[in-house]
């Protein structure tokens, strides 16, 4: 065909499988969050919020106590001070596709059902946050310093 698809497929097949860290405290990056309850659902049938993402390291298990960081973020309009309050919850379900899991390991996408108010997880409101064990989470950074330089010219544009 002239598009070198065979070379591309050969290259993809040679990409090494990344090493997985199963021993560190778990960290999962959230790429989706949602409320699985239908409008008008009976109170007895309400479920907690759900977060979807991938585990970076460690293992998550049903029943684990977790924190979601940074959680609720507020900014004082007068002083400009930014504060955050992490959410604490517990894992009540783990799913990959339609499969119920007892535990989840790094790699692939999973859904984590939690004992958390579904309003907190509605409409992807937790995207970019981290799930992990309490007291074993990375620090929250409010400010970062960035050093950059402009390219003198662009090639191929």
Regions found by a protein language model. Give the residues of each.
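Conserved catalytic-core segments of large NTP-driven translation/proteostasis enzymes
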Residues: 1-154
């Amino acid at each position: 065909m002239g598009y070198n698809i065979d070379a591309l497929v050969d290259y993809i097949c040679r990409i090494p499988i990344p090493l997985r860290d199963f021993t560190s405290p778990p960290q999962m990056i959230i790429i989706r969050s949602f409320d699985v309850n239908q409008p008008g659902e009976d109170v007895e049938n309400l479920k907690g919020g759900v977060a979807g993402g991938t585990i970076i390291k460690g293992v998550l298990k049903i029943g684990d106590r977790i924190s979601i960081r940074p959680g609720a973020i507020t900014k004082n309009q007068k002083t400009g001070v930014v504060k955050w309050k992490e959410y604490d919850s517990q894992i009540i379900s783990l799913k990959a596709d339609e499969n119920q899991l007892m535990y989840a390991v790094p790699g692939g996408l999973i859904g984590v059902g939690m004992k958390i108010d579904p309003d907190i997880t509605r409409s992807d409101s937790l995207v970019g946050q981290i799930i992990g064990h309490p007291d074993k989470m990375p620090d929250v950074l409010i400010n970062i310093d960035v050093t950059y330089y402009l390219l003198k010219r662009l090639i191929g544009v």
